[in-house]
From Swiss-Prot:
Protein name: Bifunctional protein FolD
Organism: Magnetococcus marinus (strain ATCC BAA-1437 / JCM 17883 / MC-1)
Gene Ontology molecular function, alphabetical: methenyltetrahydrofolate cyclohydrolase activity; methylenetetrahydrofolate dehydrogenase (NADP+) activity
Classification via Gene3D superfamilies: Leucine Dehydrogenase, chain A, domain 1, NAD(P)-binding Rossmann-like Domain
E.C. code: 1.5.1.5, 3.5.4.9
Pathways involved: One-carbon metabolism; tetrahydrofolate interconversion
Length: 285
């Protein structure tokens, strides 16, 4: 029987710590951290994410600047807005909600964000610093995964961690973070031969592939820790992760649920990046 790693509770604790830290920054330094969120178009899922981020900012005492643009907004107009936010001293974190409309080059947009305001941790400069192990904005979801392991008392040192998925948003950065925590890391993907055998040797499994219930319990070594980053709709229309929760629960020593696992951590770490950005901008330790 697995211990359930409660992402909601851990995220709530992170957000409460941040709320107190923001209060101190306001009191001692007259500084209010600010996050600008840019949404292009009216994608319903993106609108929900943006609303959640705004609400989370308000609860933590962080200033929230929302920029909702029409789907017809040109790339040049979007880049001009980002440059304006780069120059705005009240903004310490900038997040452009993905996906963007097809006529806009996502990579160009992400690279236009100042590395010192890159709240999502996606800028190539910050990714490079992650590779070299230097202090940087960390990608929110992988950082949330690492925080969950830490709070749950799981030390990756000396353990075999298998990451399923090689995206720039989760797979690659979480592998780098696990490596920095002294785990032996294997990255698996759609071309990996005999995926099941590789996963069976893992002490820690991070599933981030976007395929509903892809990992069955028979792949999980007795006592392994399972972190499910996937968020999918199952055949029954219900939200589910990349791992088959019920069967993996029987084998794992600890597991994250979907929903209520990694998801809440992503927003908590986004707020943490914003507060860190404000402190760095004002040389506050």
């Amino acid at each position: 029987m697995a211990h359930v790693i409660d992402g909601k509770a851990i995220a709530q604790s992170v957000r409460e710590e941040l709320r107190m830290e923001v209060e101190r920054l306001k009191l001692n330094h007259q500084l209010t951290p600010g996050l600008a969120v840019v949404l292009v178009g009216a994608d319903p899922a993106s609108q929900v994410y943006v609303r959640n981020k705004k609400r989370a900012c308000e609860t933590a005492g962080i200033a929230s600047f929302s920029h909702e643009l029409a789907a017809t907004t040109s790339q040049a107009e979007l880049l001009a807005l980002i440059e304006q936010l780069n120059q705005d001293d009240a903004v310490h974190g900038i997040l452009v909600q993905l996906p963007l409309p097809k006529h806009i080059d996502e990579q160009k947009v992400l690279e236009a964000i100042s590395p010192s305001k890159d709240a999502d941790g996606f800028h190539p400069y910050n990714v490079g610093r992650l590779v070299t192990g230097d202090p940087t904005f960390q990608p929110c979801t992988p950082w949330g995964v690492m925080e969950m392991l830490k709070v749950s008392g799981v030390d990756p040192k000396g353990k075999h961690a298998v990451v399923i998925g090689r995206s720039n948003i989760v797979g690659k950065p979480v592998a780098l973070m696990l490596l920095a925590a002294h785990a032996t890391v294997t990255i698996c993907h759609s071309r990996t031969p005999d995926l099941a055998e590789t996963v069976k040797r893992a002490d820690i499994v991070v599933a981030a592939v976007g395929r509903a219930n892809m990992v069955p319990g028979s792949w999980i070594k007795k006592g392994a820790v399972v972190i499910d980053v996937g968020i999918n709709r199952g055949e029954d229309g219900k939200l589910c992760g990349d791992v088959d929760y019920a069967s993996c629960f029987e084998h794992a020593s600890a597991i994250t649920p979907v929903p209520g696992g990694v998801g809440p951590m992503t927003i908590a770490m986004l707020l943490k990046n914003t507060v860190e950005g404000a402190k760095r901008a004002h040389n506050i330790a």
